[in-house]
UniProtKB/Swiss-Prot annotation:
Gene3D superfamilies tied to this protein: Conserved domain common to transcription factors TFIIS, elongin A, CRSP70
Species assigned in the record: Cryptococcus neoformans var. neoformans serotype D (strain JEC21 / ATCC MYA-565) (Filobasidiella neoformans)
Biased composition, class Acidic residues, residue ranges: 36-51, 148-162, 181-190
UniProt feature, compositional bias: Gly residues: 386-395
GO BP term, pick one: poly(A)+ mRNA export from nucleus
Primary residence: nucleus
Composition-biased stretches (Basic and acidic residues): 8-20
Keyword Transcription regulation: yes
UniProt protein name: Transcription factor IWS1
Keywords: Nucleus, Transcription, Transcription regulation
GO CC terms: nucleus
Length: 475
């Protein structure tokens, strides 16, 4: 147990120790602590403006230094140019050379062009270049007279010099054009890719709107052969040989009971050439149609070629304008006629072959190709021609001679009188009839008997109209 006296002693000793520590700290050297003091706003602004002013001064010094260096470089270059400046003699020689290039000198091409006059400079006169105070002095040109002998010689040499002058003039024009093109290329601005593409597109659009230039074919001769025609002929000749070889391969494969695929393999290539309209004349000239006939012919076992081959060829043949002479040479008519008669082809191919036969046969039988002017015989005209002994040959009544017997047409009234005693009605027998001639239209049948009926109907219409008008007036 602690007494109050002991507590008092401990408190006193603690206070003494604390007092001694404070005194010891006071005798130690005091270190200054950084104190943050508030400064007025004007001081801060001065501190900010001071570095900005320093930066501006540095920039001005740099600019002045650069200008000084540039002036020094200009002075050095000027001194070099002065040292390299040509002398007066060199300038005079350069001007003389330029003058000779522009106006020509002795021995140049331009000096050979004068026939009736000789141009020369006066002796003692020279070209004086222009100066700061005086203009350039150009020498005078005078016409010198020739002797009569020289004139006679020139007249004899006119014909020989004419061709040479034209050649030299053409060469000079060509060189002038080349120089102009080079100058245009140098002066042309550099364009980016987008601008170049746009200009190219505009040029193509303008070219489409313009009319194409007529291409004149060269006349074929010993030394002058049209390259395009010869190229087309080579293509068609090679194609004909390959088509015949493919047909031979398929026939050989058919004989050994194997499928023939040679023609199918090159069908696309053949159709690409046959559809090209620019090659049609070469196709006819080089016998490609004979190879087409080989492709359409039946195989040794009497089988027909592939349906794809038939369809492709019969689609392109009507587009080719083949005349009678060409059809005789290529022998394509008999095979097309065979496709109109056989029943082993599709109806579409049969119709196409029939249309080809009709189109190719019109020039032979002297029939026009225009359907509007085409003439069709009627049944009445056929009967009349038969009744006249077959001499009419399909002529109309107006074209018949006066001595020919006129065939009497079917009399309806007489037929009704003959069948009047018959009782009952007979059923109509419907038959599938294929007409070889055009039947008589029903509108013209019994036309004479129906004329009075039409007159009565017209009179009735007039009377009804008149009756209506009278009624309206009464009301």
């Amino acid at each position: 147990m602690s007494s109050p006296a002991l507590d008092t002693i401990h408190d006193q000793t603690g206070e003494q120790d604390l007092h001694q520590e404070v005194q010891a700290q006071e005798h130690l050297p005091v270190e200054p602590t950084p104190e943050v003091q508030e400064e007025p706003e004007s001081d801060h602004q001065d501190d900010d403006e001071q570095p900005e002013a320093q930066v501006l001064e540095q920039e001005q010094e740099q600019v002045a230094e650069q200008e000084r260096l540039q002036d020094q470089e200009d002075q050095d270059q000027g001194a070099e140019l002065v040292s390299q400046q040509p002398t007066a003699e060199e300038q005079e020689e350069t001007r003389d050379e330029l003058y000779n290039e522009v106006f020509g000198n002795q021995g140049s091409e331009a000096s050979d062009l004068s026939d009736d006059e000789d141009v020369r400079m006066d002796e003692g006169e020279k070209y004086v270049p222009a100066t700061a105070t005086s203009a350039a002095k150009i020498p005078k040109f005078k016409k010198s007279k020739r002797d009569d002998e020289d004139e006679d010689e020139d007249e004899d040499e006119d014909e020989d010099d004419g061709g040479e002058r034209r050649r030299k003039k053409k060469k000079r024009a060509e060189r002038r054009r080349q120089r102009q093109e080079e100058e245009d290329e140098d002066e042309a601005p550099v364009l980016d890719e987008a601008t170049q593409r746009r200009l190219a597109l505009e040029e193509r659009i303008d070219a489409i709107g313009k009319k194409p230039k007529a291409i004149r074919r060269k006349k074929k001769g010993d030394d002058d052969v049209d390259i395009v025609d010869s190229y087309h002929d080579d293509i068609c000749a090679r194609l004909r040989d390959r088509m015949i070889a493919a047909a031979d391969k398929d026939e050989a494969a058919n004989r050994i009971k194997m499928p023939g695929t040679a023609k199918l393999a090159m069908l696309d290539e053949v159709m690409g050439v046959l559809r090209n309209t620019t090659l049609w004349q070469s196709i006819v000239d080089n016998g490609v149609l004979e190879a087409v006939k080989r492709w359409l012919e039946p195989l040794p076992d009497k089988s027909l070629p592939s349906v794809g081959i038939q369809k492709a060829i019969f689609e392109v043949l009507p587009k080719m304008d083949l005349d009678t002479t060409t059809l005789k040479e290529c022998r394509l008519g008999p095979i097309v006629l065979f496709y109109t008669k056989t029943k082993r082809v599709t109806p579409a191919i049969n119709r196409q072959a029939d249309a080809l036969v009709q189109a190719w046969s019109r020039p032979i039988i002297k029939r026009p190709a225009n359907y509007r002017s085409r003439y069709i015989e009627s049944q009445n005209e056929v009967e009349q021609s038969q009744g006249g002994g077959g001499t009419g040959g399909g002529y109309s009544q107006s074209q018949r001679g006066p001595g020919e017997r006129k065939f009497k047409r079917f009399d309806v009234k007489k037929a009704l009188e003959e069948n009047a005693h018959r009782k009952g009605a007979r059923l109509q027998i419907v038959q599938d009839v294929q007409y070889t001639v055009a039947p008589e239209p029903k509108t013209h049948h019994h036309a004479e008997e129906m004329q009075h009926v039409s007159r009565i109907q017209q009179d009735n219409k007039k009377f009804n109209r008149f009756a209506r008008q009278v009624k309206t007036k009464k009301h």
